[in-house]
Amino acid sequence: MGIIRELPEQLANRIAAGEVVERPASVVKELVENAIDAGATKVDVDLQEAGIRLIKVRDNGHGFHEEDAARAFLRHATSKIRDEHDLFRIRTLGFRGEALASIASVSHVLLKSKRADEDGFEMTLEGGVVKETNPTATNVGTEIAVSQLFFNTPARLKYLKTSATELASITDTLNRLALSHPEIRFTVFHEEKELLRTNGNGDLKQVMLAIYGRQVAAQIVTASSKTSDYTLSAHLVRPEVTRSNKQYVTLILNGRSIKNFALTQSVLEGYHTLLPIGRYPIAVLEVKMDPMLIDVNVHPTKREVRLSKEKELCQLIRETVQLTLREQRLIPSVKQEPKLKRVTPSEQSKLDFSMEPQPKQADSVEWNYPIPRERKETLTSPSQWNPAPLVHEPEAEMIEPEQVEESVRQSERLPALDVIGQLHSSYIICGAEDGMYVMDQHAAQERIKYELFYEQLGRPEKEYQLLLIPLTLEFTQEETLAIEEVLPLLAEAGITLEPFGGNTFLVREIPTWYPQHDLEGTIRDLVEMAIQQRSIDIAKYREEASILMACKRSIKANHPLNMEMMRQLIDDLSRTTSPFTCPHGRPILVKWSTYELEKLFKRVM
């Protein structure tokens, strides 16, 4: 007698729920996506006990036909695709027909729905089994209440995180859905406390304001670019505002929030050298593309996708972010915070929550980038990439690629700075028409040397000079074996190691632009970096080698400079492509405006 048998429907649904319904946030995601697919313009979410006791989602979509309601809770039952060809042109968020069946199998469900031309009804399910269906009075749309989640799978309930953690996961899920659909009005409550409210007017900036707050919204820069396959719209937050992890980079493909390591990495590369190590940006990128180029049928959660032209999209994102941020004048400005004042209940009704700037009085310090004054300049980049066509608000016209190559609109670079002196042999004090600037001399020269070394390392033909006395370098046996594997990488950096017996190598020539001070130390550092990297990634090695040499060969703090040296440093900095941060993302200049200085001295109140 055979031992293989077909599993009962309820057991199969419960097994499938292990993939589809991982936690309360999974239920929220599936229900809200169904509401969006139903054409809703308003979605309300109510939660109790972080969704474990109750998740209620109401929408004003087109609603269910009564005869479709029970069928919707069957496995692989859906209205969104009809045949296998539809899998290659998916335009809805859901399509697998698994979510409702999986959710119902591990919870109690109350469904209320009404179409505009039909009477309303309600259906009750327990553990995936329909208990009753009755007519009811309700508004057009659908309301689904999921209660007692995981009541029949105690092991899954046991391994849920704390309520705070589960609620944070739900909030993140809803934030991404709101960012993906700014045209929909979302309201989210947890035990009568409002967590999110958007106005549904289609303005993504307003959604970012609702989610991230006013400080972030004030630093948003927008850009758009286009290729034959992709249309990209980017909302980037200036590098002044950062976070400690990558989850604040939101990728939206055809209205679907996704996870994709390569695309996220392209965003980070666009911010490269503008952020401190260990800090990450806030950014929302929307991509419109042919559904044929994307495969969302990879995982039941549909967050992971495959792209057929991923490299092209990565390049478009990286170049758009790079060019957009390079056009900004990223000089932090010191501003005074207003003193805290108690507000009486009678005064609360008079508070103004508009985004208009208000005069400030204060004691503490806030870092803000000023709004750039724009002018055209020729863009030169050490990486010599060809920028994608960009358009920035308020202009609403697409720029063709050939136009970008001829003329790239850039914001004003460094202001005209007059050197006043040096502070603590580390900082250069400068005056300008709009205030006072303080420059970090080490960070400034680090940026200058980084771009110099990056350009020189990228040249296919390097000019060499013979050493009067060859440099002898001795390594361990382990290092010697590793060096043999990375000789092509070292050659890219202009280092030719000639075996000299045993674990010894000779260096007979070096590029003419190599720093002469501590030559052996420089070469050893580059060899060590190549050994650690192992893989032959020329671009990455070129980048890291440039940063290493720039950092170690730049003037340090506590190094006195005369007036001519300081002026030369400022002049050299003005010729760089990004004179606002060092290669590690630290600011080079800080500004005190004339107005802020006058406030400090009580000349203005």
Swiss-Prot record:
SMART domains: DNA_mis_repair (SM01340), MutL_C (SM00853)
PROSITE patterns, alphabetized: DNA_MISMATCH_REPAIR_1
Biological source species: Exiguobacterium sp. (strain ATCC BAA-1283 / AT1b)
Protein purpose: This protein is involved in the repair of mismatches in DNA. It is required for dam-dependent methyl-directed DNA mismatch repair. May act as a 'molecular matchmaker', a protein that promotes the formation of a stable complex between two or more DNA-binding proteins in an ATP-dependent manner without itself being part of a final effector complex.
Entry keyword DNA damage: yes
Family per similarity comment: Belongs to the DNA mismatch repair MutL/HexB family.
Gene Ontology CC entries for this record: mismatch repair complex
BP-aspect Gene Ontology terms: mismatch repair
UniProt-recorded Gene Ontology molecular function terms: ATP binding; ATP hydrolysis activity; ATP-dependent DNA damage sensor activity; mismatched DNA binding
One Pfam family it belongs to: DNA_mis_repair
UniProt keyword DNA damage present: yes
The encoding gene: mutL
CDD domains per record: HATPase_MutL-MLH-PMS-like, MutL_Trans
Entry-linked HAMAP family: DNA_mis_repair
UniProt-recorded name of the protein: DNA mismatch repair protein MutL
UniProt keyword terms in alphabetical order: DNA damage, DNA repair
InterPro entries hit by this protein: DNA_mismatch_repair_CS (IPR014762), DNA_mismatch_repair_MutL (IPR020667), DNA_mismatch_S5_2-like (IPR013507), HATPase_C_sf (IPR036890), MutL/Mlh/PMS (IPR002099), MutL/Mlh/Pms-like (IPR038973), MutL_C (IPR014790), MutL_C_dimsub (IPR042120)
